[in-house]
Amino acid sequence: MAEARLQRLLRVYVLDTSALTDTRLRSLLGSGSLDEAVRRFAELIASVRIAYGVEVYMPPTVYEEARRFLLSNGVTVQSFEALAAWITIKPPTRHEIRIPASIVRDYVEEVRARLARGLRVAEEHVRRAFEAGGLYAAETASREARREKLGAIIRGLRERYREATRHGMLDSVEDLDAVLLALEVRGVLVSNDEGVRRFAEALGVISIDPPKFISVLQGLLRHSKTGGVAREEAHSTS
């Protein structure tokens, strides 16, 4: 039974958006552009699906998010559709999936703690803005200088607020759909998002990052080719 589960885990995968947008994919696939990387990714998935029956899923919400990102970053419609043709788009059955109450409780506690940290970050930057206002009074500084100072404070606020409230935490419907779908189909979640993977693993879902996923697929393809050669040699000598 354990062997059968392992075999299933090796051939069922659910992708989140980062599985297609990870900046390391270009070098791993030997591509000079994102468009070329998507085309090579499509060829790789197609090959292992044909050779091993590997199943690759993606929720509709993730599909739309990935599509918007890729098409706005130089990927052609043809390349994206070539990739999407080998991915099964399936929504999770949200009304049937059960999540343990302890996990929901831990998640709510983390949200509360992060909101408190975010509030402290906001308060700190309000104080900085107030102090800067005294240093850059209208009669002693140009409008451009005040704008630059305020812009620097706002950028710092955004960066630190994002770090305090979102980094390392599941924070979108798209990510949640990917986790739920992986739980439903009993597959491996492919994501480079620390928070998404942590939430998935709390539910017992195995997760790997995109480079590992590429490595697994390439390994399967190499095994398929060497196995095919071995079978041909055995047949010729018999």
UniProtKB/Swiss-Prot annotation:
Top-level lineage group: Archaea
E.C. code: 3.1.26.5
Keyword DNA-binding: no
One Pfam family it belongs to: PIN_5
Catalytic reaction list: Endonucleolytic cleavage of RNA, removing 5'-extranucleotides from tRNA precursor
GO molecular function terms attached to this record: ribonuclease P activity
Keyword annotations: Endonuclease, Hydrolase, Nuclease, tRNA processing
Enzyme class: hydrolase
GO biological process, one term: tRNA 5'-leader removal
PANTHER family with a match to the protein in the record: RNA-FREE RIBONUCLEASE P, UPF0278 PROTEIN TK1425
Role noted for this protein: RNA-free RNase P that catalyzes the removal of the 5'-leader sequence from pre-tRNA to produce the mature 5'-terminus.
Family stated for the protein in its record: Belongs to the HARP family.
HAMAP family, per database record: RNA_free_RNase_P
Protein name, as recorded: RNA-free ribonuclease P
Organism in which the protein naturally occurs: Hyperthermus butylicus (strain DSM 5456 / JCM 9403 / PLM1-5)
